[in-house]
């Protein structure tokens, strides 16, 4: 990973045009080739980004007023969309090899919820059938991939406490899975013991169904039914 802190401006050129004026920002270049631009707010969300596959070309261009050559990064994807990052001042430039990430390790309850739901996948609806648990994608495994009563693909993300991060994670999985002609269209189910109101609103706005899981009921202590909302 490369982390650059610089005073820069950013121009996006593609389906539309967008401009970030000159300011101090963090530029993050990951091993997969992705490039993202961050400010000192917005939590984990970048101001702008380019996902792989894309290329990063470091060059210079002449400043019109002074005639001085200043650094210019050109990040371009296969569609020809570009991020043009003009660097006025470089504060820090650091490389670090993070190595292969083992991925997110679910806690015991989440892992057991996944196992139980996979065993009783029909609790999501009559006619549902399991394809597999931990369905692999380039950005990590989907908890459960199944099919509904009409044969449509459904990706299920399971959390103990469902927040916005979980909805965003499922949204990224759905974006990738829907590029696969053998699976598309792929619907989403966000399942958790407790789903925060903001997460539910975001999920429903994106067409993702929310399912509240009762851990004890799934284990057969009270009943075998889920409460669906």
Curated annotation (Swiss-Prot):
Keywords: Cytoplasm, DNA-binding, Endonuclease, Hydrolase, Nuclease. One of its GO terms (cellular component) is cytoplasm. Pfam families: NucS_C, NucS_N. The keyword Amino-acid biosynthesis does not apply. InterPro entries: Endonuclease_NucS, NucS_C, NucS_N, NucS_N_sf, tRNA_endonuc-like_dom_sf. Its EC number is 3.1.-.-. Disulfide bonds: none annotated. It comes from the Bacteria. Gene3D superfamilies: 2.70.180.20, 3.40.1350.10. It is found in: Cytoplasm. One of its GO terms (molecular function) is single-stranded DNA endodeoxyribonuclease activity. CDD domains: NucS-like. The keyword Protein biosynthesis does not apply. Its main location: cytoplasm. Belongs to the NucS endonuclease family. NCBIfam families: PRK03298.1. Cleaves both 3' and 5' ssDNA extremities of branched DNA structures. This is Endonuclease NucS. It comes from Corynebacterium diphtheriae (strain ATCC 700971 / NCTC 13129 / Biotype gravis). The gene is nucS.
């Amino acid at each position: 990973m490369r982390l650059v802190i610089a005073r820069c401006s950013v121009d996006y050129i593609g389906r539309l045009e967008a401009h970030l004026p000159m300011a101090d920002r963090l530029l993050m270049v990951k091993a997969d080739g992705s490039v993202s631009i961050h400010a000192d707010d917005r939590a984990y969300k970048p101001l702008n980004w380019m996902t792989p596959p894309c290329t990063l070309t470091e060059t210079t261009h002449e400043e019109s007023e002074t005639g001085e050559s200043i650094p210019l990064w050109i990040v371009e994807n296969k569609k020809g969309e570009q991020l043009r990052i003009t660097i006025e001042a470089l504060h820090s430039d650091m490389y670090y090899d993070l190595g292969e990430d083992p991925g997110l390790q679910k806690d015991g309850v989440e892992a057991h919820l996944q196992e139980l739901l996979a065993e009783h996948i029909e609790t999501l609806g009559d006619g549902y059938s399991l394809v597999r648990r931990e369905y692999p994608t380039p950005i990590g495994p989907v908890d459960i991939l199944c099919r509904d009563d009409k044969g449509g693909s459904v990706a299920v993300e399971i959390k103990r406490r469902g927040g916005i991060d979980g909805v965003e994670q499922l949204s990224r999985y759905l974006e990738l899975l829907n590029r696969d002609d053998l699976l598309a269209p792929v619907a989403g189910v966000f399942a958790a013991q407790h789903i925060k109101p903001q997460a539910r609103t975001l999920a429903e706005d994106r067409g993702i169904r929310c399912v509240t899981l009762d851990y004890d009921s799934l284990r057969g202590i009270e009943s075998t039914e889920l409460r669906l909302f």
